[in-house]
UniProtKB/Swiss-Prot annotation:
SUPFAM superfamilies, per database record: Ankyrin repeat
InterPro entries: Ankyrin_repeat_domain, Ankyrin_rpt, Ankyrin_rpt-contain_sf
Name of protein: Ankyrin repeat domain-containing protein 7
PANTHER family: ANKYRIN REPEAT DOMAIN 36-RELATED, ANKYRIN REPEAT DOMAIN-CONTAINING PROTEIN 7
A Pfam match: Ank_5
Record carries keyword Metal-binding: no
ANK repeat residue intervals: 67-96, 100-129, 133-162, 166-195, 199-228
Superkingdom field: Eukaryota
Keyword Ion transport tagged: no
Alphabetical keyword list: ANK repeat, Repeat
Length: 262
């Protein structure tokens, strides 16, 4: 069994940080020579030039570059609030996607430009659009540890149980990033404590696979199910044992929890 679990653990370690994990702070990699004048002005926040270009018939407010980015995408990624407001006044498409299916809202949240994200939400941006990895704006907000952005997105009916390509809900993203405060916050907002990823790993299983003490205590307080198994049949207790988390039985006992294995 040790050999089987060791193989499965190695396999999952490579998958727990996959291309589907939302990463924050990543703006667009821009080469000036590849940008049209309109996009260049939006990316640097030059509102004066942007207005001049849009007065010319050859420029359209929704013009896309080779990677399907609009001026709104670039303004949101770079935090140019005044440009975002102007483009919306010009009736730009607010939910348009780039080559990675990212909407301007997703890009604003990913780059932690909260002012831009707030404007977009107030103007009707869809908080539940998914990028090519099925991450929503909420996944990125959780990864960026922005409680105010998470709160805003939930106020605009962001899906708390949305799953990316790995099956991670925002709660599971918070667990993987070892962020007890965000985990607690999401649970208080009604996140499913027993949600599981594509390998049927629950928050508790993922928690005992990392730096578990605070997270495990928190999840136990929330009544997490102890008997859930991953696709190989392992429970959180078995993950804890093989990861050297030897106090797990004491933790469950101290919270009055008994194991009822299915």
């Amino acid at each position: 069994m040790n050999k089987l679990f060791s193989f499965w653990k190695r396999k999952n370690e490579t998958r727990s940080r996959t291309s589907s994990d939302p990463s924050i702070g990543q703006g667009y990699k821009l080469r000036e020579k590849d940008l049209k004048k309109l996009h260049r002005a939006a990316s640097v926040g030059d509102l004066k030039k942007l207005k001049e270009y849009l007065q010319l018939k050859k420029y359209d407010v929704n013009m896309q570059d080779k990677k399907y980015r609009t001026p709104l995408h670039l303004a949101c990624a770079n935090g140019h609030r005044d440009v975002v407001l102007f483009l919306i006044e010009q009736q730009c498409k607010i939910n348009i996607r780039d080559s990675e299916n990212k909407s301007p809202l997703i890009k604003a949240v990913q780059c932690q430009n909260e002012d831009c994200a707030t404007i977009l939400l107030n103007c009707g941006a869809d908080p539940n659009l998914r990028d090519v990895r099925y991450n929503t704006a909420l996944h990125y907000a959780v990864c960026g540890q922005s409680f105010s952005l998470v709160e805003q997105l939930l106020d605009y009916e962001a899906d708390l149980e949305a799953k990316n390509k790995d099956g991670y809900t925002p709660l599971l993203v918070a667990v993987i990033n070892n962020n007890p405060k965000m985990v607690k916050f999401l649970l208080e907002k009604g996140a499913d404590v027993n949600a599981s990823d594509n390998y049927q790993r629950t928050a508790l299983i993922l928690a005992v696979s990392g730096e578990p003490t605070r997270l495990v205590k928190l999840l136990l307080q929330q009544g997490v199910e102890l008997s859930c198994r991953d696709i190989c049949g392992f429970t959180a207790e078995e993950y804890a044992y093989f990861n050297g988390f030897t106090v797990y039985p004491q933790f469950t006992a101290s919270h009055g929890r008994k194991k009822h294995v299915k």
